[in-house]
Amino acid sequence: MILTWATSTNIENSLIDFLRNEVIEQALQILDVNGVAKTVNVYAGRELNNDWNLPLIQVYLDSKPDANRLEIGSNKRLKSFQVIIDIRTLLPGQETNLADWVEQEINDGITIYDYTPNSLNPEAPAKSILGYGRVDFITSMPVPSYDDADVFDKNRYRLTIKIWMNG
């Protein structure tokens, strides 16, 4: 058996796909210091990549804090997956506005897909609906900036969410 995507990766990728689709659908942009509109980018990964372009939404799975049994004697569980969403923008105040937008978009939950490799096009894995993820907000707050912060850390906001799934 070749292990490809597990539930954790499916949840992370489903959230990323959802946000990317919403950005495209709404043609979401933010102004830079010169008043030029910049499209919001959505990236995956815990580590910051210097090749990424601001403004951005960074998404990664943090932990799996809950796995409660659904009923006595059952092996079915209600699992939660804690996800970090870091928002990094070009100008002060934009990070809060973009965080509000993200909260509004994911408030009703997201469809979770089961991804499988596509040998013909590795950049576009096949997907089928795995279930629905309920979203709970754990924290929503600006990340304090420090004096010599680089461009990626000056205007930053962090959302911590739990996505719940039966399984």
Predicted regions and their residues:
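Extracellular/virion structural assembly segments
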Residues: 74-78, 88-121
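Short N-terminal helix-initiation segments at or just after the protein's N-terminus
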Residues: 13-33, 96-104, 158-167
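Hydrophobic beta-strand residues in large extracellular and virion-surface proteins
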Residues: 15, 19, 42, 57-59, ...
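Small/polar-rich, solvent-exposed N-terminal microdomains that initiate assembly or binding
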Residues: 1-73, 116-127
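Oligomerization/assembly interface segments of phage tail-like spikes and tubes
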Residues: 75-95, 153-165
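Compositionally biased, intrinsically disordered low-complexity segments enriched in polar/Pro/Gly
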Residues: 1-9, 48, 137-146, 167
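Acidic-leaning, charged glycine-interspersed low-complexity segments
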Residues: 107-164
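Generic marker of residues within folded, mature protein domains
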Residues: 49, 75, 149-151
